Amino acid sequence: MLLKPYRLQKPDGTVVDTLHRQYYIKDVSIVTDYDPLTLEENNAMPYDTVRTDGIDILYGKNGRSIRPGVLRKSNYIMPGRLYNERTVEQTYSSFATLRALRNVNIRFSEVEENDTMKLNCTILTSPAKLQGFGVDLEGTNSAGDFGFASSLSYQHRNLFKGSEVFSAKVRGAYEALTGSQSEGNNFWEFGAEASVLFPRFLFPFLHENFRRKMKVNYSIQTRPEFKRAIVSAGWNYIWQERSNMQARHVFKLLDIDYVHLPKISQSFKDSLPESTLLYNFTDQFIVGSGYTYSFNNYDPQNRLRNTHSVRFSFEMAGNLLYGLSRLTGADKDDEGRYKLFGINYAQFVKGDIDFSKSIVLDNRNKLAFHIGIGVGYPYGNSKMLPFERSYFSGGANSV
């Protein structure tokens, strides 16, 4: 890389080439509740000031809306160090993960001290709208069966004053099935879910900032053939590469599903092979972990470019429980399966790859295609994949 000299203009107008100046960071301040009208025009003063690790945090009218430690750990520009453009980019990227903030602006001002050029750094942050509600209504038509669905969602972007995002959602759906003899034979579903997304979690031995997400989910489905309830809980780590923000990684540290079928009609039982009924329509646990990688080069600023997306996922379930069952000498049932609290648990490995591409024909038309490949293999405590992890052909995108 060729670095051109710094051109200095003298008072008489002449220009000379000199070495680039090195700037050291002097003072660093983080301003919350930044508003150009009140802070610049009216010269409003902060309500509270906190100093932590040599950095001044100036709180505004909303008080200590975000904990000082969270703001401090989001900043990579430190007093006494040389100015570095990379640390500025890292700071922008880190503050962008704080959903409690709307805008971030980093400013520098020159300060000459003992013949050394220094910079004062001010990080200006504006708060986002912390709470929001959403309502969705939709109509459905599945093979001539009409129905509707509705959901209500709530989100809080600063639950524990650390920019944690709390989300909750309830959903209901109803579908009138063709040929039903009474309203009670139609399909309906109810579900509720809640999750907390933490802005970052520094993972040992890695330099990426992980976001941690914990979630719980409950859903119940009623059909003429059966009634099924599913309780789920998960602990995930999510991160994006700083060098490639279009790539996303999700590591499912722990994913737990409990499937309960309190009712199955006799006619439905008679229509299924015994093995399918035994392994797919019985109560069971699914306890496992997995990893998902996704990439999408879509750019909303350039909608006329060809785009593609790739998604790869891998999941394993039941291995830890199976190992513990063998280690403790647990008894097997008549089918040769171990149980957890008297309930079967699934054991399998599963992988999926999806690829899609869109080719722009003109400003109104695109050609799109998609291909997906998936493989699942049950073993150990299972002879078939659980119904919730099985593959299907049909629906709006049927092949």
Question: Which residues does each PLM region occupy?
Answer:
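Periplasmic polypeptide-binding modules associated with outer-membrane biogenesis and secretion
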Residues: M1-N141, R171, G351, G372-G374
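C-terminal outer-membrane beta-barrel translocator/porin domains of Gram-negative envelope proteins
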Residues: N43-P46, T140-A143, V250-V399
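Surface-exposed flexible segments
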Residues: L39-V50, A149, F226-I238, L324-E335, ...
